[in-house]
């Protein structure tokens, strides 16, 4: 049998390289999922343990190009205003409305919308990045967002009140011929969603629920010769009243807090569910000085008790009507504003940003030029003066 011969390889040649096996796709995806889960766990722990620090991190990233002074303020906005001016923050843009004009400035201070007005009494309502500017008793409404004018609306009645809500939805209370009052609900484009004509009760103001399914109107009616207040609740698919919650006192301000309707009267702060269930925070004879309903899960009230020598009291209340925290206030309060998890109080000599426990998150001294404060949900605040506004970045 013939012997087989094998050729020897060249030992001086480079040794063959081992070919690395490709990792199966499932294994790679599993590894990426583990890494992503670990990162999310770290972020979640950080958020849960210190939300204030997390908001500070967000601000440092979002406003890294802002030129700040030593106090942490960035001077962004220049405008003209007068004693009638109203202000709103629209996702970083500043809206200034007076009886003579509307001006909208973007986050760089550039005017993106301007129009002249001839209003006798201007009013403004803003929420969730949109605003309505109107004249009390007039028929024209300007609907705006951070980019400019959405729609100029000419309504069929005299406007009593407008309340902006979540998702751009808003309620307009007006006097229409043939009825005591009418409430119209619109979406963020100014398109009609719902109309309710009241022939029995005078409706003072109204709000849309956070989920956009209900409308609640503050009603005033007579019972045995005396006036009675209530919150009438309607589903936006029916003109039949779904529920009613009894209130005491006239309604000064209305909105939503923690998924419930919230009405501030001269007697108490009321929280009403869509089924009519009412919880309240009684003012105990004190007078309501200021109210902030813009936070996610709490309302803030500034109360003055003239019976006890004019003592001023600041309270934070949750949607169950329970006082979360409170403090005595010795300084004059020029303005207050709530957003997200924060409350900004503009005193005559300083600005203080609190959390819902009334713990100080930030303090800014020397605010003599500021007349209004607009709290932002990220923990920053806009300080508005007569002709200029600055952004405070703690």
What residue spans do the PLM features occupy?
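N-terminal Lys/Arg-rich, disordered targeting/topogenic segments
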Residues: 1-30
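Non-cytosolic head/periplasmic domains of membrane-anchored proteins
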Residues: 113-218
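Hydrophobic membrane-insertion alpha-helices, especially the h-region
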Residues: 30-48
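Hydrophobic beta-strand positions that form the internal "hydrophobic ladder"
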Residues: 94, 131-132, 169-171, 212-215, ...
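Solenoidal tandem-repeat scaffolds enriched in leucines and small polar residues
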Residues: 179-272
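Repeated scaffold domains used in trafficking and secretory/extracellular systems
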Residues: 28, 74-88, 117-129, 157-166, ...
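Structural motif
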Residues: 50, 101-103, 139-143, 178-184, ...
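A short beta-strand motif characteristic of beta-propeller blades
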Residues: 65-79, 108-116, 147-154, 191-197, ...
